[in-house]
């Protein structure tokens, strides 16, 4: 059985980026049914929470594994090639179906719309996961069979002393009961919307950081677009202001921030230093297309 510093468990997706000049009305892309939509700057990349975070951890010098399910197709081969290039062990499985795909439609200075087809990403059974041991298990969002497998493995490993980092998405919080995972979570990272949703779902009142910590996580980090990022460890609150930067594309920035923070904790940094590292990592991704091509390369493993 292989030993790791950290194993990421989540989706592996082929990302297709396109930019449009389509007008925006009422916060929506304005296009008629039946019309063609012209896009520019078409780019292909590998995405998904598991591969994004794994790349970040590996570049920070940690021995990294990745649990995800891909299809038996060219996109799946590209994902395996990326993991190999980034020195990440593939601990998941290859299904008979297709690899998941996201189409990311960008409008300069406005934002993006993402169309996602998750395919094999959500079809992973726990029996298909290769056995491993790890100090940290980083969970990003999965649905279907894969969520059941992820939860089962996370709860089992937490009992054996593995630390859990959790970065749940809005759709996961809405659609699944995640309380059991939260109870064993060492680090929980989410954005303001996700945090509000979580507090509301489990009827937690009072200041967000405190109310969510009562669900079990030892350290909570809440990001909030251009507003200060806040963290709480049950003793004191910390905050850091994002820098004013030119945002080119947001895909993968959340994964980069979250894995940057967890990498800092793994390197025994103080929380303030973890926030600085996370911010630097997240902002390195915001300035370019693609979720991981500009992730930092810096060995911080102790």
PLM region spans:
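Conserved phosphate-binding/catalytic region of the ribokinase-like
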Residues: 1-6, 16-20, 173-174, 205-302
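Glycine/charged-rich beta-loop-alpha catalytic/anionic-binding loops adjacent to active sites
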Residues: 30-41, 79-84, 236-246
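C-terminal catalytic lobe of FAD-dependent flavoproteins
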Residues: 103
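Glycine-rich phosphate/adenosyl-contacting loop at the front of the ribokinase-like
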Residues: 1-65, 77
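A glycine-rich beta-to-alpha transition motif near the start of alpha/beta enzyme domains, typified by
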Residues: 64-90
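Ribokinase/PfkB-type carbohydrate-kinase core domain
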Residues: 2-20, 80-94, 107-239
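Alpha-helix C-terminal capping segments
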Residues: 54-63, 106-107, 264-268
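Short, conserved phosphate/pyrophosphate- and ester-handling motifs at nucleotide-, phospho-/glycolipid
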Residues: 57, 191, 254
